[in-house]
């Protein structure tokens, strides 16, 4: 515990905010190239095959990112846009791929929450 004199001389050190998506380096999104597209299994109470991709970003950082929605067209060397946002039951996955931009097509036959999945308005 510091004395009052020490606080007057030095003061308190302010806490630094820790970023939840450090690889984006304060950008809202970042572009990258898929190096590996694969499926992985979630943590304990859940069971599924979640689609994920390893992406090398334009700043040289390689991250694991989640591919949302039903079905995708991504493969190695696909150029994708990454946004922040973790997947709770996949450890180490802190980013989402933005559907409907660059090489990633929107989800087919999507009626609700279309903007989140890059789906066009049905006729």
From Swiss-Prot:
GO molecular function list: rRNA binding; structural constituent of ribosome; tRNA binding
GO biological process: translation
Keyword Ion transport (UniProt): no
Alphabetized Pfam families for the sequence: Ribosom_S12_S23
Keywords annotated in UniProt: Methylation, Ribonucleoprotein, Ribosomal protein, RNA-binding, rRNA-binding, tRNA-binding
Record PTM 3-methylthioaspartic acid, positions in chain: 89
GO CC terms of this entry: small ribosomal subunit
CDD domains: Ribosomal_S12
Keyword set includes Thylakoid: no
InterPro entries according to UniProt: NA-bd_OB-fold, Ribosomal_uS12, Ribosomal_uS12_bac
Protein function: With S4 and S5 plays an important role in translational accuracy.
Family annotation (NCBIfam families): rpsL_bact (TIGR00981)
Similarity comment text for this entry: Belongs to the universal ribosomal protein uS12 family.
The protein's assembly and partners: Part of the 30S ribosomal subunit. Contacts proteins S8 and S17. May interact with IF1 in the 30S initiation complex.
Listed name of the protein: Small ribosomal subunit protein uS12
The gene coding this protein: rpsL
